[in-house]
Regions:
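Pore-lining transmembrane helices
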Residues: 1-40, 47-263
């Protein structure tokens, strides 16, 4: 048979511990690489054997004696506070996870929010509802903005190449991929990112407050059949997407009128 390694019980520090130890380990390896000087013929030994062995020993000891107890204490405290706060705690959690999910669309903050959300969901502390809704709201909202901008303002508020990308972003959103909205954030972060976050926060929190629940750790069409109160869940997505679209259109129009936004498709 095949031997598989697994923990006998979940590591209590979860994502928080992993984040701390990964940062510390990275700086440790950098420091050791600078301080440990060996002859040239031993450089390969240093980089492929010595540094990995020393850093692995350090990580093992630090995790066992420091990070796991400390991270577990922090993680346990967060869970206790959220659980004790009841519905208010669940709504605060939903707002925080939604904001972190929408702010950088698959970037490091988004991934951190995902690890936290999946950790809480795996341990059946809080569902992953807000996280999953916040993934799809920005791209749907941005795609919608490229459709309604001219109808609302009488002007095209995006450069020509962004219009087809808006439709692509909407399609990818239904696959659970938020990165389709990244080109809009790169082109004008001051109009896109706040709109993503506000739409995601309002839509996700509204759905959670009205009783939508998702425990399955996926997003979009892959998870929708398993959602409790799917109608409320979809209404939250629609609400968030509309808010995102209207905010983007309004902010871009204001910037255009102030001469701070150049548009090649007018």
């Amino acid at each position: 048979g095949t031997m598989q390694w697994e923990t006998s019980s979940p590591v209590p520090s979860t994502f928080i511990g992993a984040l701390i130890i990964s940062i510390v380990a990275g700086y440790l390896v950098k420091w050791m690489n600078q301080k440990i000087q060996l002859p040239d013929f031993l450089l390969a030994f240093k980089t492929t054997f010595l540094l990995p062995i020393l850093s692995a020993i350090f990580v093992m000891l630090a995790m066992y004696y420091v990070i796991t107890p400390f991270g577990g204490w922090i993680n346990g405290g967060i869970r206790t506070v959220l659980t004790a706060a009841g519905e208010k705690g669940a709504l605060m959690y939903a707002m925080g996870i939604a904001a972190a999910t929408a702010i950088d669309l698959g970037g490091p903050i988004n991934k951190a929010a995902g690890f936290v959300a999946f950790s809480f969901t795996t341990d059946h502390v809080l569902p992953v509802t807000a996280r999953s809704i916040a993934i799809v709201i920005p791209p749907i909202g941005l795609g919608l903005a490229t459709i309604i901008d001219r109808r609302l303002t009488g002007k095209r508020l995006f450069n020509a190449q962004l219009y087809p990308q808006g439709k692509t972003a909407m399609f990818l959103a239904f696959m659970g991929i938020s990165e389709g909205a990244i080109p809009f954030a790169l082109e004008s972060p001051i109009t896109a990112i706040p709109s993503y976050m506000v739409g995601a926060i309002v839509g996700s929190t509204a759905a959670v407050w009205l009783g939508a629940v998702q425990w399955f750790p996926e997003s979009a069409i892959w998870a929708w059949p398993l959602v409790t109160n799917l109608g409320v869940y979809m209404a939250g997505i629609a609400l968030g997407a509309v808010i995102t679209a209207l905010m983007v259109v309004f902010l871009r129009l204001m910037m255009f009128r102030k001469g701070k936004l150049l548009i090649d498709s007018l």
